[in-house]
Amino acid sequence: MNITKKNSLFASVPVFLVFLCMGFGDVAGTLTDLVKNEYQLSNFMAGFIPFSGFIMFGILSIPFALIMARNSKKLILSIGLFIAFLGLIIPTIFGFSLFVVILLSILLLGAGAALLQVAGNPIMKDVSPEGKYSRNLSFGQFVKAIGSLSGALIPAAAAMWWGMDWKILFPIYSVALAVAFILLIISKINEEKTGSDLPSLESCFQLLGQNKNIALIVFGIFVYVGAEVSMASKLPSYLETNFGLKIEELGVASVGLFFLSIMTGRFLGGLILNWIQARTFLVISALLSLVGVAGLFVGIQSVAIVSIVIIGLGFANVFPLVFSITVEKYPGKTNELSGLMVTAIVGGAVIPVITGFVADHISITMSFIVPAIALIYVLYLGLTQLKPNIQ
């Protein structure tokens, strides 16, 4: 399309930086154990940390997708960066002595990340050459994974080298958000119009009710995100329970290994999509993830570590692939689809509760059946619901 050709390489720089900041929202999961120990929280109270980080996806995504349709994607990105920045500076102003301050900070960071997801995924299409949207979205998710990984690695590095703890994340993230905001404001991005009719709240839900295919795809995003958060939150406990590896010593490292694998997988995915179709790659990714989850049931430490890497590589491209395939399948419904699919990220607040219930009543290992079922559903989507000729 001509409009994408008008966007220079420089226009994509702030968009990729937005994806980096988008990854900061995943800190809600990686910091849970560290914050729990800091404030001596119960497991129930600690559960409000990831809940706060993901609940805003369910509340804000559709309303801001509708606002985006009437204004611009760039405006929504700017608002998202500002809200996330506001959340990160709150502890700096009020201090870290109260847990409620951290909870409010994570809530606003999650709200900002929700807006970045709503506008970031479709605006990537505006700065991508024709036919390269899936590839660039995978690269964008690779950059996002760097942001996610930083939530696990920066606290560990700060403790090792500077004698500091997880609180160092807040000023570092604040600076990154400020830089992204400035670069975005001064950039010029030609945005593609995605339909003659402005979407409404009613049209979004009508899309779910009238198009079974879209409803199944949105549910796929819901269960996939829930599976990813479940894996990230349960892997440290799995390693301690089965192999005696202490969460205090290896918890962050195990989550870091998972996100490092995701980051690597997204980079490789951006390259692989130059040669194979997005739908084929989605099926391969789902199968690879299922192989990795199966490896967790073997009960051998070395196999478990390799399985974590395999799971991360498989998980890496599921979200950007499903998103990009769907948007290209229904080009006139980009705003509604963006709102619906980002709303479905609220699965990250719901599915882990089910996984935790299974872990409490059966075992940590058996709890991975829950994300495995989610992956089987993603495989079903790739094989049956994401064919180009299905309308």
For the regions a language model picked out, list residue spans one by one.
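Helix-to-loop junctions at the C-terminal end of transmembrane segments
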Residues: 60-73, 265-277, 359
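Conserved MFS/SLC helix-loop-helix module at the cytosolic interface between two early adjacent transmembrane helices
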Residues: 59-99
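Helix-loop-helix hairpin linking two adjacent transmembrane segments in secondary transporters
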Residues: 140-189
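Cytoplasmic helix-loop-helix junction between adjacent transmembrane helices
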Residues: 105-142
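Hydrophobic core of transmembrane alpha-helices in multi-pass small-molecule transporters
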Residues: 99-115, 303-317
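Extracytoplasmic
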Residues: 10-36, 121, 231-236
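Extracytoplasmic gate region of multi-pass secondary transporters
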Residues: 28-29, 211-256, 263
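Glycine-rich segments within core transmembrane alpha-helices of 12-TM secondary carriers
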Residues: 132-155, 339-351
